[in-house]
Amino acid sequence: SKSGTDLDRPLSALVYTAFDTETTGLQPSGGDEIIQIGALRVADGELCPDDTFEKLIDPGRPIHPESLAVHGISDTMVRGKPAIGAVLPDFHRFCEQSVLLGHNIAFDMRFLQIKERATGVIFSQQILDTLLLSAVAYPNQEHHSLESSMDLLGVSIDHRHSALSDAAATARVFLKLLPLLAERGIITLGQAIEASKKRPMPA
């Protein structure tokens, strides 16, 4: 629920769904589509490796070569997979009772929100962006890409750039940020959301 009570709860006491999407390209309003969603649960201050969601999605359109170079998901790999309209209800159920966690999560949320009318699936959960939280914890750092945040915090992951491994990297970054945020007096979900809003958007 998006109830006010969650806002007063300590970050360490909440349940999260860390997630990432891979897409055909970078322009959701220009018709780009999600081709993979990967997510995993974070609870009691740790990753839940058995509680994951991973789906390939047929976008019904070609994948841009630049995007293919990043995620390695080809047209052949997604052809005949379920359409987004079939996957989003399942994903929504998976993350229903949790705070959504992503790195530059605004990008992923735009892709989800643009589908609201067509699918009737509305993601109204609280959200936290590890990119913004990394900028709060490291105000003098210039770069806050997922790679930069991983380097800063000593997080390593086996395979980068599948949606699920990026979700796992995001979750690990988040858990490493918690004590650094606490040092800055940021303990509750509400405080983390407020601190994120005050940050100028880093590059």
PLM-predicted stretches and their roles:
Residues 23-25, 132, 169:
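Short, glycine/acidic-enriched loop or turn micro-motifs at the edges of active sites
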Residues 1-10, 171, 175-203:
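Acidic two-metal-ion nuclease catalytic site recognized across multiple nuclease folds
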Residues 132-135, 151, 172-175:
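Generic alpha-helical structural context detector
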Residues 166:
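Conserved catalytic/binding loops enriched for acidic/polar residues
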Residues 2-8, 12-125, 139-161, 189, ...:
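Conserved non-catalytic scaffold segment of RNase H-like nuclease domains
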Residues 122-134:
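Conserved beta-strand -> loop -> alpha-helix junction used to position metal-binding or nucleic-acid-contacting
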Residues 88-90, 170-173:
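Short secondary-structure transition/capping segments
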